[in-house]
Amino acid sequence: MKVAVIFLLSALALLSLAGNTFSAKVTGKEASCHDAVAGCPRIYDPVCGTDGITYANECVLCFENRKRIEPVLIRKGGPC
């Protein structure tokens, strides 16, 4: 019985430590939102967000970020 308890506690400790190494680091650049005051131009210049969604342009991404707690970054220019 003692061996089983020690084994389970060891496995639990190992899993809790290993959980930190599996977190994915999201990389990208922050959208330039200084021009996004009144509205966005209707120019299709797509950007791919770190959330996997294609936004029509960087300005649209800025307006979406205003609704969020955690901002979406630009993963790359062009569609996802």
Curated annotation (Swiss-Prot):
Changing D45G: Fails to bind sperm. No effect on trypsin inhibitor activity. Induction: By androgens in adult male sex accessory glands. Expressed constitutively in pancreas. This is Serine protease inhibitor Kazal-type 1. One of its GO terms (biological process) is regulation of store-operated calcium entry. Transmembrane segments: none annotated. The keyword Metal-binding does not apply. Changing R68T: No effect on trypsin inhibitor activity or sperm binding. The record marks Y44, D45 as: Necessary for sperm binding. Changing Y44V: Severely impairs sperm binding. No effect on trypsin inhibitor activity. InterPro entries: Kazal_dom, Kazal_dom_sf, Prot_inh_Kazal-m. Changing R66G: No effect on trypsin inhibitor activity or sperm binding. Disruption phenotype: Lethal with no survival past two weeks of age. Animals are small and show severe, progressive degeneration of pancreatic tissue associated with autophagic cell death. SUPFAM superfamilies: Kazal-type serine protease inhibitors. Changing R42L: Abolishes trypsin inhibitor activity. No effect on sperm binding. Keywords: Disulfide bond, Protease inhibitor, Secreted, Serine protease inhibitor, Signal. Disulfide bonds join C33-C62, C40-C59, C48-C80. The record marks R42, I43 as: Reactive bond for trypsin. Residues 27-80 form the Kazal-like domain.
